[in-house]
């Protein structure tokens, strides 16, 4: 299967630059892959798609303000660091710009010395391992000095950084938001729960690889980035009980899908408490073991996320739905509209 098989025409003006005033005011395209139907709706009508006895599974990761702007104390040269993942203690893997100025031992100062990064190791493609020194609590220092790492296709400044977090964000660690969850309000979640749907949370810390284009033609040669995930025993038990009683596992977003399918693949379709790193690549031909339906945003042409949706609903039907979304002027990507796939 070829990367170009997942290409489609997307006018640049359909890439949403800012979030809508109300989270759940976005449009929702409901696609039923068995009956090959699609219905234009609004996101708050997702309530109609959920049935009593279902479980709605959400990723409660929280985006760190992971973009830091600082300078080298000796030369005052400007340096940008993007935090990717905490390797141990105060050591982080980062993406540095310009990386060539940062050799092992080089220091970078942020916020007039409130935070100092010392390079301990050089990696490829501009990556570095740095060790931070600071007074107080690291996350509090980061909250005051860092900026939200918005995706490369968003050029507008974000006025309210909370709009790039889900309302249920809890576990610090992501370099990008699990954007399918941005549409939910607390009020909508209450209505869903009142309907008899179980709300279940897992964690997958979204890495920057989520924006990395596929650089090979043959999909079998593509290697996915690794991301940390965690599912508690309580969540696993709830989901297994829902399955056993005939309810559906409805995932919110591709990160929830990848976590559930990673664990389901390890334990023959059953869910157990588990944590680790996953680089699962879900593409057409993959047999889903856990997820019965899901919501997701509209993704980039030729991306692994379009491939994942195609694995569930069929490539031709998914591309037909995407072309419909373009014709109907749906908004795309992180701050865009959503689809519900069943």
UniProtKB/Swiss-Prot annotation:
Listed InterPro entries: QueA (IPR003699), QueA_dom1 (IPR042118), QueA_dom2 (IPR042119), QueA_sf (IPR036100)
GO biological process per UniProt: queuosine biosynthetic process; tRNA wobble guanine modification
Any one GO CC term of the record: cytoplasm
GO molecular function terms listed in the Swiss-Prot or TrEMBL record: S-adenosylmethionine:tRNA ribosyltransferase-isomerase activity
Cited Pfam families: Queuosine_synth
Compartment(s) where it occurs, according to its Swiss-Prot or TrEMBL record: Cytoplasm
Known EC number: 2.4.99.17
Complex and partners: Monomer.
Family annotation (NCBIfam families): PRK00147.1, queA
The protein's name: S-adenosylmethionine:tRNA ribosyltransferase-isomerase
